[in-house]
Amino acid sequence: VACSGDADFIPIEAQPEPGLSMPPAVEGPFPVTRVVDGDTVRVLIEGQDTSVRLIGIDTPETVAPNRPVECAGPEASVYAEQLMSGEDVYLELDASQGTYDNYNRILAYVWLEEDLMVNLAMIDAGLAEEYTYDDPYTYQQLFQEAEQDAKDDLRGLWGQIC
């Protein structure tokens, strides 16, 4: 879906989710080397530039070969850059999703702080849809509720941006 975009679009400021905190089993911190798009980031792990796909979300395409840039894709990418560029992140794996996807990207929840998860922040801003690949995942219900809230409030994809 192509769209004209909204140059004045500013997503909501990322807010911690009450009662949600980074679990003790996270890995990191890892420096972000590049934000690829709204749901993929590259981080430095043991000297290797490694691609990470955020679990449970799907953002509009901006870099897929042979596909047009989708509505709100640039905005999702910019917001992800605002959240993660120059930051150190922590990765939480989810056994239900496996370690890698079909493109050899690590599958993870990406945490910026003790109580701020990027995956959820993207949905809260209305710049990502909840996405279940095959099996249910740890934060599925929370992500689905956040998506419904974004829809109800007409944020991002569900507002005037598209």
Where are the predicted features?
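Small beta-barrel nucleic-acid-binding modules, primarily SNase/OB-fold domains
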Residues: 3-162
